Curated annotation (Swiss-Prot):
Gene3D superfamilies to which the protein is assigned, alphabetical: Vaccinia Virus protein VP39
Spans traversing the lipid bilayer: none
Protein encoded by which gene: bioC
Protein name: Malonyl-[acyl-carrier protein] O-methyltransferase
EC number: 2.1.1.197
Function: Converts the free carboxyl group of a malonyl-thioester to its methyl ester by transfer of a methyl group from S-adenosyl-L-methionine (SAM). It allows to synthesize pimeloyl-ACP via the fatty acid synthetic pathway.
GO molecular function: carboxyl-O-methyltransferase activity; malonyl-CoA methyltransferase activity
Keywords (A to Z) from UniProt: Biotin biosynthesis, Methyltransferase, S-adenosyl-L-methionine, Transferase
Family the entry assigns: Belongs to the methyltransferase superfamily.
Annotated catalysed reactions: malonyl-[ACP] + S-adenosyl-L-methionine = malonyl-[ACP] methyl ester + S-adenosyl-L-homocysteine
InterPro entries for the chain: BioC (IPR011814), Malonyl-ACP_OMT (IPR050602), SAM-dependent_MTases_sf (IPR029063)
Pathway participation: Cofactor biosynthesis; biotin biosynthesis
Biological process terms in GO annotation: biotin biosynthetic process; methylation
Length: 278
């Protein structure tokens, strides 16, 4: 997926993001709790956040580690501006950089960070294994990486409905949206990147919307619909209509249609004896 398209779409939706990013807010709350449980604020002098979005997680972590230098990287300029305003309103200081983190990490000083955090960002990586090596490289030996991301069961009702819609229309099915890595995939890639003491947990979050179009509107409002946009014209409209019909006929209850998120939480420690090459 083109990084330019991702950056553009998230920038466009920066204002509406916080209203609709309900699961992402829950992820930020849990992630901040994980961070404060495993770290001593007096031992953390330099923090890096990957993909800060509008600054929800940034604000909480920055407040807790008030004496540390805090740097946040975000690919979407619109999101970055929202994050800056967010922190300024709370009197918090943070160094912000607009960049593609997958390239940016390799330009930073090795063994310079006491903590790296990231909420709901890693699923967008084009080269996760390569980027994890870069993150391990800039962490001090024994320093933690703590992040959350989405697992493959996310939106399973939607994917099932698309699969059946393709079949009903006599079409070959294609994936609509990102291919999420599993908890096992992340564990393997973290090990290969030189991380140790890896702890991974999964949690399912379920939201309910009045109808499928309301759900799709919410996805679009947080900028994530760029991962689902395939095809155009009459064929796409027919597919979308059939998908919605199947979804609501199969899954709708009195309260509305369910939408499932598989959330993966990860804690890992940078190895003390690994040499990193780009």
């Amino acid at each position: 997926m083109q990084k330019r398209a991702i950056s553009s779409r998230f920038s466009e939706k920066a204002v509406s993001y916080e209203k609709y990013a309900l699961v992402q807010k829950k992820m930020a709350d849990h992630l901040s709790q994980m961070v404060t449980e495993i770290t001593n604020e007096n031992d953390v002098r330099s923090i890096l956040e990957i993909g800060c979005g509008t600054g929800g997680l940034t604000r909480v972590i920055r407040s807790y580690f008030s004496a540390a230098h805090y740097e946040a990287v975000e690919i979407a300029q619109g999101m970055l501006e929202q994050a800056k305003n967010n922190l300024e309103q709370h009197g918090l200081i943070c160094s912000f950089s607009q960049a593609d983190a997958e390239e940016w990490v390799w330009e930073q000083q090795a063994k310079s960070k006491d903590l790296i955090v990231s909420g709901a960002c890693f699923q967008w990586f084009a080269r996760p294994a390569h980027t994890l090596r870069g993150l391990a490289r800039i962490l001090k030996p024994g320093a933690p990486l703590v992040f959350s991301t989405f697992g493959p069961d996310t939106f399973w009702e939607l994917h099932d409905s698309f699969t059946n819609a393709h079949a009903i229309l006599g079409e070959k099915g294609v994936r609509h949206g990102l291919e999420f890595l599993s908890a096992r995939d992340w564990h393997e890639q973290l090990e290969q990147a030189g991380f140790t003491d890896i702890e991974i947990s999964r949690k399912y979050e379920r939201l309910t919307y009045p109808g499928v179009r309301d759900f799709l509107h919410a996805v679009k409002a947080v900028g994530a619909s760029v991962s689902m946009e395939q095809g155009s014209g009459l064929g796409r409209r027919k597919l979308l209509a059939e998908m919605i019909r199947y979804y609501e006929q199969t899954y709708k209850r009195e309260t509305g249609i369910p939408v499932t998120y598989e959330v993966i939480y990860v804690r890992a420690v940078s190895s003390r004896a690994v040499t990193f090459f780009k």
